[in-house]
Amino acid sequence: MPQRESCYFCGAASTSDEHVPPRAVFPKPKDSPDGRDYRRQLIKVPACDAHNSATSKDDEYLLYVATMSLPANSLGTHHFLTKVRRAIEERPALIRSIVKSAQRVHVEDIETGSKFATYAFEVDGARLDAIFEKIARGIHFHETRTRWVGEVVTLVESEMSFEDLEVNHLRESVVKAADRLFSGVPLSGSNPDAFCYQRIAFPDRSLIRLHFYGAVRVVATLAN
């Protein structure tokens, strides 16, 4: 009887396959504006219970935050107005915990120059870091069939600080550097409107740029 592969994250015996990123990110036909099934040809990696089924609440948190993010494309917005809205009606506790910190802000689109009012809210940074770390490790395993045992550092490109403008300037510099670095690197993923990624491999590290709903981007650095 063939043995299952070990967990992509911790190396324990795998008990199932984990979708990378979580399947919840990808709309079913009834939740997509064109009736398309975005759940075809998804990436899967072997995982133990602790790094798959036990993190289902984190999957839902990621879905809420990504679809509510300002850079999300029309698919992400539609997914929020369908699947996420139904979930909110059934289980309102999560959305209440997210929007309790909401602040009305005015933003400017640096590409068009248009200005408009919207809401900003505080996210659970540590929770998102853990979620994106899992995804980055999953992508690494998918690409190499080996488990990454080094460190993973993630940066959400659209995140902003209301208290430290210097942090925002630093983040902006990192995003511009990422734009230059990943320019010309092909996008991978069968459903790019929902999720795709870019990867650059070096001998001792690799960089992965995650794209959710078009422009909700996260840079992950995998280094020893």
Where are these regions (language model features)?
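C-terminal, charged low-complexity interaction regions
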Residues: 113-224
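A broadly used, surface-exposed interaction patch
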Residues: 51, 66-79
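Short Cys/His-centered divalent metal-binding micro-motifs
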Residues: 41-65
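Histidine-centered nuclease catalytic patch
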Residues: 6-44, 60-61
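Short flanking/linker segments adjacent to small metal-binding domains or redox-active Cys/His motifs
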Residues: 86-123
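N-terminal alpha-helical interaction blocks
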Residues: 1-2
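Amphipathic alpha-helical interaction segments
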Residues: 54-62, 72, 142, 146
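Short Fe-S-cluster ligation motifs
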Residues: 34-49, 77-92
